[in-house]
Structures are given as structure tokens and as C-alpha cells.
Amino acid sequence: MKGRWVKYLLMGTVVAMLAACSSKPTDRGQQYKDGKFTQPFSLVNQPDAVGAPINAGDFAEQINHIRNSSPRLYGNQSNVYNAVQEWLRAGGDTRNMRQFGIDAWQMEGADNYGNVQFTGYYTPVIQARHTRQGEFQYPIYRMPPKRGRLPSRAEIYAGALSDKYILAYSNSLMDNFIMDVQGSGYIDFGDGSPLNFFSYAGKNGHAYRSIGKVLIDRGEVKKEDMSMQAIRHWGETHSEAEVRELLEQNPSFVFFKPQSFAPVKGASAVPLVGRASVASDRSIIPPGTTLLAEVPLLDNNGKFNGQYELRLMVALDVGGAIKGQHFDIYQGIGPEAGHRAGWYNHYGRVWVLKTAPGAGNVFSG
């Protein structure tokens, strides 16, 4: 996964800096039917959302992972988990939540009109080889000893680290960078062996700089068009030297630790289920919190199609770019998940689910 603290997520960092809106555009899923909120969380009689959550099975799987991997976290939240699952077994109608002892606290959103930001992240699968050969020329490194300041990305690309720290060679410098930014990935050595999981091992200590912002500042990509796909397309249409120069603008560099097999885990040390878990700002959304989210649906070009789906998700991860009323939805593993993650910089409504009555302080775990 992205490691416990590394989440300088490509999209979280790229899209978090995209322009805040002074008007009320709706092309990214914003809604304004609930009026203005005056506090971060507002207790509502029932979520004003049509339909039932579409991912009851995935939510149940995520709760099982919490129960098995973190008994303490499960114990802190078991009343909510049990109530929500009983509600789901009865059909999951939002009009009936109170009958199951569930309170819904609507989040105010970044604009105070209930529009909560969604971005996405995923776990890539990287093609690689154990030795440098053919197209496989781009090293993936393990953590070197920290003897003073470690080299910058540009210095590492120039050969500043010994070959003894190389774990594998991939066929794409951009793929390496994306795994670096996501904080982990699966490695396919192409020999029929099971995928290896390369987990986050550390970073070089240099400041992170968004290459998406660099492209925008240079006039290479319009702000409104910025996405992971836009960055990939730019890389595919420019020379290797130009791609390297762009990536070197981000001096931060991540190192990895190979594992024969490991499930993707978040900062809460719980395996993550795609689109049933999120990264959150722990200062307002504690680990294990259950969320009912109205997630905007996107077409194949990443455009909001005017519809939403209700999903239940659990806050199990963190991210350096995830602050305030903003969630990063874990999309899963591989290219399809990456495609979904790459488009998300949209808005929807979110309700924090707690056990009634009132649930006391909604900020407490």
C-alpha cells in the first residue's frame, strides 16, 4: 500500500491543489440542495439520498478484515458495524436507519454546502525483471542506510546509489514513479511466479513536489484537465529525457521492501477492500469510522455523468495530501483500478454513521 505515512498520492496531491471554486459549478458532482452548513457535522433525521448502498458484500468483507486484523479497532466500533449490517440485511433503506439505532451526521464539505471532495488511489502492478535486460532498464530500490542526507531523485537517477540496493528493473520510469507516489505495488517478474508485494520501506527525506502542478505551471496541461491519465499521456508523447526531467522536479523518492505475499494494508494495518475503504484526515475522521457516501459516477473519459451511487466505506488509511473534508477512495489493484483512481477529483455527500442516540462526540473513535 502506500505505507503508513507516505501517502503523497499522485492524485491527492495533484488534484488537491486544483482550483477551488468561487462559483457553484456542478460538472464535478457538486450539489447545493441541502443549504449551507454552519458546523463540520450536522445530525440529520435521515440521509437525503435515494436507494440503498450497492456494496453491502464488500463492506461486510472489510468489516471481517478489521475483526481479524485489529480486534481493538473492531471492538471500538463493533456497535456501529453490527447496527449497519443489520440495517443492510433489512434492505438498507436510508429512511429506516433510525430503526436500527443509527445516527447519520452529514459532513459540511469544503465549501460548507455538503460537497466533500473525493480522489482515488490504487495499488499498481509493475512489470519487472530481476536483472537489467532489454526494455527493463529502470531500477527499483530498497532502503539504503541513512548516513546523513540521502540523494535526491535526480541524483538517484544519475546513479548516486549502489547497485546493491536494486530490487528489480522495470520497463517504465513513469510506472516506477507512480508506484513511488502510491507507496507500494505488486511486481510481476514475468516468470510465472506469484506476484511479489513491494511495500513502503522509507523515503529519502526530500520535500515532495507535485509534477502535476509543474505541468500546469508550464502550460503543458490545463488545470481543469489534470489527471493521472493526463500525466501518463504527457509521458507517452514526450521523450525519455523529457520525462526524466519532469520527474526530477519532485526530489522526494520512495524505497521499497519485498514480500513474497501480502495483502494491501492501510495505516490501520488492516487489509483494504477496493471501494469499501478510504484514507481520511484522522483529526476529524478517526480510524474505523463508518461512512455512507454518495459517490459521483464517471464515464470512461472521467466526466461526471450526473448520477451517484451509495457506498459504505471505512476510514482505514491516511495521506499527506488528505486534509479536512476530503476522502481518498481506495480503488483496488491493477490497471482497471488505476484507471478509476486517475480520474477522481469530484464531489459528493458523506454521512458519518454512529450509534444513536446522538453518539456523543462524533470526532471520537
UniProtKB/Swiss-Prot annotation:
Its EC number is 4.2.2.n1. It is a lipid-anchor. Residues 1-20 form the signal peptide. It comes from the Bacteria. A lipid is attached at C21 (N-palmitoyl cysteine). CDD domains: DPBB_MltA-like, mltA_B_like. One of its GO terms (cellular component) is outer membrane-bounded periplasmic space. Loses rapidly its activity at temperatures above 30 degrees Celsius. It is found in: Cell outer membrane. This is Membrane-bound lytic murein transglycosylase A. Murein-degrading enzyme. May play a role in recycling of muropeptides during cell elongation and/or cell division. Degrades murein glycan strands and insoluble, high-molecular weight murein sacculi. Forms a trimeric complex with MrcB/PonB and MipA in vitro. GO terms for molecular function: hydrolase activity, hydrolyzing O-glycosyl compounds; peptidoglycan lytic transglycosylase activity. It catalyses: Exolytic cleavage of the (1->4)-beta-glycosidic linkage between N-acetylmuramic acid (MurNAc) and N-acetylglucosamine (GlcNAc) residues in peptidoglycan, from either the reducing or the non-reducing ends of the peptidoglycan chains, with concomitant formation of a 1,6-anhydrobond in the MurNAc residue. InterPro entries: 3D_dom, MltA, MltA_B, RlpA-like_sf. Optimum pH is 4.0-4.5. A lipid is attached at C21 (S-diacylglycerol cysteine). GO terms for biological process: cell wall organization; peptidoglycan catabolic process; peptidoglycan metabolic process; peptidoglycan turnover. Keywords: Cell outer membrane, Cell wall biogenesis/degradation, Lipoprotein, Lyase, Membrane, Palmitate, Signal. PROSITE patterns: PROKAR_LIPOPROTEIN (PS51257). It comes from Escherichia coli (strain K12).
